[in-house]
Amino acid sequence: MKKIAIDLMGGDYAPEEILAGALSFAKENEDVELYLVGIEENFKDVQLPKNCVKVVTDDFLPMDVKPTEAVRRRKSTMYVSCQLAREKKVDAVVSAGNTGALLACATFVVGRIKGIERPTLAVPIPTKNDFCVLADAGANIDVKPSNLLQFAIMGVEYAKLLGKDNPTIGLLNVGTEENKGTQKEKEAFQILKERFGNQFVGNVEGNDLNAGKVDVVVADGFHGNIAMKTMEGAAKMITELIKSEVKKNIISALGALLMKPVFSSLKNKLDPKKYGGTFFIGVEGVVVKAHGNSNRTAIFNALKVAKKGVEEKLPLKIKEALLKCAE
């Protein structure tokens, strides 16, 4: 039976929405044993399904916690969840808590895969065709070219898990020419070209991310996070503009009614809650970061992501890819 720990106190809407999403998932996935890691009051008047295990501690991390503090507070719900993974009592961890704190706990408590310098936060980004994987999306601000190579290796394995065959790779840069960017990007370009051959398409710009030109976009966490947040902001603005325009007159309103299925499909494609969570890849276990503002639906989907990561043996595939790269 697959075993997943969930941090009930991580996220803007903890614990109510986290617990509701977890219980809903447990009821629909009886082949998964869910470890609910929370404080005693989280479980008051709650009837747990038979495949849920209550894990009680007495501390939790605020959303503005520093990563260094996160690894010192060993009784926090996030730390205890990761400790369960370290001790092999669970196969995966899910948390909607602070990103930096979860990265620190994943790295130093769960532990890095041997050979991985920096675990990466890899995020599916919607494109006009389907999606691409962005690695890194904010976990690693200052990186070396060798880190970008490992992000590419891990991003490729994640893209394969999501159904991409022989994923193509692009390096996020300020232009498509080979000589663009800082020395870091120039060196990374040559390393990626040597390692992946034709699988590496070359440099891609920010406006290429949603165009579906590549399956994996490699970036440092600083620029990757800016690109991701810019896309999220643009999608939100477009949605709000459409809502505003259709209310201006009766003709627009009638047209909107006819276009309702199209708008619904578009909203679903752009909704980050659809993916629920994404992986910290490169650690000895499956660790899923759910969005900080996750509701019960997003938590349900984050647990689905974790289950798939366990079923597909993602950490093992990362190890195999690293060995192949070293040959």
From Swiss-Prot:
It is an enzyme of class 2 (transferase). It comes from the Bacteria. Keywords: Cytoplasm, Lipid biosynthesis, Lipid metabolism, Phospholipid biosynthesis, Phospholipid metabolism, Transferase. Pfam families: FA_synthesis (PF02504). Its EC number is 2.3.1.274. Pathway: Lipid metabolism; phospholipid metabolism. Catalyzes the reversible formation of acyl-phosphate (acyl-PO(4)) from acyl-[acyl-carrier-protein] (acyl-ACP). This enzyme utilizes acyl-ACP as fatty acyl donor, but not acyl-CoA. NCBIfam families: plsX. Belongs to the PlsX family. This is Phosphate acyltransferase. It comes from Thermosipho africanus (strain TCF52B).
